[in-house]
C-alpha cells in the first residue's frame, strides 16, 4: 500500500511555506498513525505571479500558489521534508493556469507525481476556476511527454459522467459547470447503454486505458460505488475501438 496526503497552501511569504507544509503533514501523520507518507501533494492551483484568476480572483492568494513561491519556497520545502524522512516523494495537483503548469512540469526540478484531470469531456468543471481556458488534455500530454507519474482525477467529472447527479446545484452557482457537463454528456450515457455498462464504470475504464496513467483516484461516497469501481478495474482496459469512440465523442 502507498499513502498520500495533500496541503492547500495558497501563496505565503517564502519563510512561512515550510512551516505550513510541515504542520499540515504532521497533522496527517498523527491522524493516520504513521511516521511518513509515500506522496505529499501541493493541493493549491498554480499560476504565474501576475495572472488574474478567471473566477474568484479575490481569493487568489488563498486558493492558488504563484510560480515564484512554488520555485523558491515550495520545492525546497518538499525536498527538506524528504531529507527529514517524512515523505518519499512530492507532487502537484495539475490544476491552474495552463502556462504555469507547463513551466512547473518542465522545471529543472520537476514534480515527482502529478494529478491530471482525465475524462472524455476534457473538463475539470467547477474546479477550473483559475484559468477559463484550462485544458486538461494539454497538461496530460505534457506530463506524458516528460514521463511524470500520473494520478488520474475527475474520472466521472463530479458526477457528470454517471447515470444521474447525486445532488442539487449549489445555491451559489459555483458548480453550474458540473451540471452543464451532465447535460453535455448525454451521448456518453447513450454509448454506455449501447455497450451495456454503467456510465461510471465506463468512465473509470476510460481513465485506466490512457497511456502512462499509474493510478485513478476515486471520489466514491459509499461501498456500493467503491465496489462498482473495483469491478470496472477488473474488467480491464477498453477495447481500442471503444476508447477511440469515447476520445472523439466530444
List each model region and its residues.
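Short acidic capping loops at alpha-helix termini that bridge into adjacent secondary structure
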Residues: 1, 35-39, 88-89, 200
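CE4/NodB-like, metal-dependent polysaccharide N-deacetylase domain
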Residues: 20-41, 80-84
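Beta/alpha (TIM)-barrel catalytic core signal, keyed to glycine-rich beta->alpha loops juxtaposed to Asp/Glu
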Residues: 45-250
Amino acid at each position: 500500500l502507498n499513502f498520500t496526503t495533500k496541503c492547500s497552501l495558497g501563496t505565503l511569504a517564502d519563510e512561512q511555506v515550510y512551516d505550513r507544509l510541515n504542520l499540515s503533514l504532521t497533522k496527517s501523520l498523527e491522524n493516520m498513525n504513521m511516521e511518513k507518507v509515500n506522496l505529499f501533494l501541493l493541493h493549491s492551483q498554480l499560476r504565474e505571479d501576475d495572472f488574474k484568476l478567471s473566477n474568484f480572483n479575490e481569493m487568489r492568494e488563498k486558493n492558488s500558489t504563484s510560480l515564484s513561491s512554488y520555485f523558491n519556497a515550495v520545492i525546497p520545502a518538499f525536498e527538506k521534508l524528504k531529507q527529514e524522512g517524512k515523505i518519499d516523494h512530492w507532487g502537484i495537483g495539475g490544476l491552474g493556469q495552463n502556462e504555469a503548469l507547463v513551466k512547473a512540469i518542465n522545471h529543472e526540478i520537476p514534480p515527482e507525481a502529478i494529478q491530471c484531470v482525465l475524462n472524455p469531456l476534457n473538463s475539470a468543471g467547477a474546479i477550473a476556476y483559475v484559468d477559463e481556458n484550462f485544458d486538461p488534455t494539454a497538461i496530460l500530454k505534457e506530463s506524458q511527454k516528460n514521463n511524470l507519474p500520473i494520478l488520474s482525477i475527475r474520472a466521472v467529472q463530479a458526477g457528470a459522467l454517471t447515470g444521474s447527479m447525486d445532488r442539487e446545484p449549489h445555491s451559489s452557482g459555483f458548480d453550474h459547470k458540473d451540471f452543464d457537463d451532465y447535460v453535455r454528456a448525454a451521448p456518453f450515457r447513450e454509448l454506455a447503454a449501447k455497450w451495456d455498462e454503467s456510465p461510471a464504470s465506463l468512465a473509470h475504464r476510460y481513465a485506466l486505458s490512457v497511456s502512462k496513467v499509474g493510478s485513478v483516484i476515486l471520489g466514491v461516497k459509499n461501498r456500493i460505488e467503491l465496489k462498482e469501481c473495483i469491478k470496472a478495474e477488473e474488467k480491464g482496459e477498453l477495447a481500442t475501438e471503444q476508447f477511440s469512440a469515447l476520445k472523439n465523442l466530444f
